[in-house]
Design a protein with these regions (language model features):
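Short, acidic/polar
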Residues: 24-38, 77-86, 149-161, 214-220
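Conserved anion-binding
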Residues: 81, 91-179
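Glycine-rich, proline-tolerant flexible connector loops at the mouths of alpha/beta enzymes
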Residues: 31-57, 172-187
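C-terminal alpha-helical cap/extension of soluble enzyme domains
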Residues: 120-129, 146-150, 183-252
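Glycine-rich, positively charged N-terminal anion/phosphate-binding segment
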Residues: 3-7, 27-34, 38, 51-65, ...
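Alpha-helix-loop-beta-strand connector modules within alpha/beta enzyme cores
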Residues: 54-88, 112-117, 135-137, 187-210, ...
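Hydrophobic faces of well-ordered beta-strands that scaffold small-molecule active sites
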Residues: 18-24, 43-45, 71-74, 94-96, ...
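N-terminal amphipathic alpha-helix/helix-capping segment at the start of soluble metabolic enzymes
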Residues: 1-25, 129-138, 195-204
Length: 252
C-alpha cells in the first residue's frame, strides 16, 4: 500500500496513538463536520442502532470526503452485501457488531476482500477512489466488535483471523452479557477485567485495539489501558452535554 492509496483512518493510526473519534446516528453532515472541527481523528456512522440507511451513508461519506477525518461504519452483522456497499461508497473501515467466533470474523473479512482472498464484488461508487481493486482492498479496514461473553471466551481465536484489522469493544453489551449493569460499565471489576483481556489479546496479535468509551474521562482511562482507537461521544451526547453546560453557565 502506498501513502496515496492509504485511507485517512490508516494515516491517522500511523501518525499517532491513540486516535479519538465521534459517533453519528442520524442522517446529517453537521455531526461529522463539528467532530472534525473539534480535532477528532475519525467519525463512526451507526447503521446498527442509528437511523442511517445505505443512501444516507453514501451521501454523507461523499459530502464529508473533504474533511480530515477517517470514516467507519458499524453494521449489525457479517452479511456480505451491506459490507460491500459501504466500502464501495468510500468508508475507510467497517465495524461488524456481535462477532462471537473466528468463523464470523473470517466472514466479515471475506466480505471486504476480492477473490481469491474473499467474495467482495467489484463495484466502486466513488470516482475519487479510482478503479484499482488492490487499492480498494488495501484501504478497507475490518474490525470485529467484541461485546459478548462468547466472544470473550474465543478472543484469541478471533484475533488470529487473517486479514482482520482490529477489534472494537462494546462495553455496554459486554456488561449485559456478563450479568453486570450498563451504567459505568468500564468501572465494574468483571467488565474491566474482560476489557483488559480483550485489549491484551488483540495487541499481542498485532491488531488495532478500539473501544466505545462514551465520554472523555472513560476515554482517557481506556487510553491508559493501551487502546489505540477510542470513540468519545455520539453527536447527540455532545449536543446534550454542551447544551447543559451553556444552561448551567446562564443560570448560575
Amino acid at each position: 500500500m502506498t501513502e496515496n492509496s492509504a485511507s485517512v483512518l490508516q494515516l491517522a493510526l500511523r501518525r499517532k496513538t491513540p486516535i479519538f473519534g465521534g459517533w453519528v446516528t442520524g442522517p446529517t453532515v453537521l455531526g461529522p463536520e463539528e467532530f472534525a472541527r473539534a480535532g477528532y481523528d475519525y467519525v463512526g456512522f451507526d447503521a446498527q442502532h442509528g437511523y442511517l440507511d445505505d443512501a444516507d451513508i453514501a451521501g454523507i461519506l461523499r459530502r464529508t470526503e473533504h474533511l480530515p477525518v477517517g470514516t467507519v461504519v458499524r453494521l449489525p452483522n457479517a452479511d456480505a452485501a451491506p459490507i460491500g456497499r459501504v466500502l464501495d461508497a468510500g468508508a475507510d473501515a467497517v465495524v461488524i457488531a456481535m462477532i462471537e467466533s473466528a468463523d464470523q470474523a473470517a466472514a466479515a473479512v471475506a466480505a471486504a476482500r476480492y477473490p481469491p482472498r474473499g467474495l467482495r464484488s467489484f463495484g466502486p461508487l466513488r470516482a475519487s477512489l479510482g478503479v484499482d481493486p488492490a487499492d480498494h482492498e488495501s484501504r478497507a479496514g475490518v474490525f470485529a466488535m467484541i461485546e459478548t461473553a462468547a466472544a470473550l471466551a474465543g478472543i484469541h481465536e478471533i484475533c488470529a483471523v487473517n486479514g482482520l484489522t482490529g477489534i472494537y469493544v462494546g462495553p455496554a453489551d459486554l456488561a449485559i452479557s456478563l450479568g453486570s449493569g450498563v451504567v459505568g460499565a468500564t468501572r465494574q471489576p468483571e467488565v474491566l477485567e474482560a476489557i483488559v483481556r480483550i485489549q491484551r489479546a488483540a495487541s499481542d496479535a498485532g491488531l488495532v485495539t478500539g473501544i466505545h468509551a462514551g465520554d472523555g474521562k472513560t476515554g482517557q482511562a481506556m487510553a491508559q489501558l493501551g487502546f489505540g482507537m477510542i470513540t468519545l461521544a455520539a453527536e447527540s451526547q455532545a449536543l446534550r452535554r454542551g447544551a447543559a453546560a451553556h444552561l448551567r453557565e446562564a443560570t448560575q
